[in-house]
Amino acid sequence: MATYGRYRGRNNQDLVEHLRRSRVIKSDRVFEVMSSVDRGKYLNTYSSVAYVDAPQGIGYGVTISAPHMHAYALELLEEKLRNGTRALDVGSGSGYLTACMALMMGPHGLAVGIDHIPELRALAEENIRLDHQELLNDGRVELVVGDGRLGYPSRGPYDAIHVGAAAKEMPQPLIDQLAPGGRLIVPMGPENSDQTLMQIDKTLDGKIKQRSLIGVVFVPLTDKERQYRRS
């Protein structure tokens, strides 16, 4: 996916149209939701780089992923993000992808964003309130503080789970919280080394199927104390 990086959009719509021209965005639904969710409102402090196709730091040693990676993840999960379904965004950070998922799931869906840094959970709420307040008002987004490595079983099972940081090993608690027919997207591999984006599907009879997708570079999925030290 590196060939798609570093494009500098004039605004959100210009960036999203570039991703469609580049065939990163393939479906109308992903195009429409990324047009609707303004990345600039999730990077208020860094507005000058909001529409650059590159990851950006948002504090506490974490980043908001590059737009092409958000588009790629949404395309992978698109068939699972339907009206009335449930999704979990692990390491929700700015709240951008949580909002996208919620909009794709319609008025009866639920997107749960989990982050173990309270300040990031508050940031996500502020950003979503600025951009799509109705998601909070209608209970379509729930933002919680917790260890995302353990998932959030009280709202599961989930039809779609996205992990925004690299896991060192297969995250079994998240697999356990997948609904039959559900899909998990997670980067896997050690910090500062080769990582692979993995697609993990749970069949309707509960079997697990894994698929390696592309090489990626993500910050590590780690504990709260270490993350504070990285900030």
Language-model regions, residue ranges each:
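Class I SAM-dependent transferase core
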Residues: 1-88, 99-104, 120-130, 204, ...
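Conserved nucleotide-cofactor-binding alpha/beta core module
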Residues: 79-205
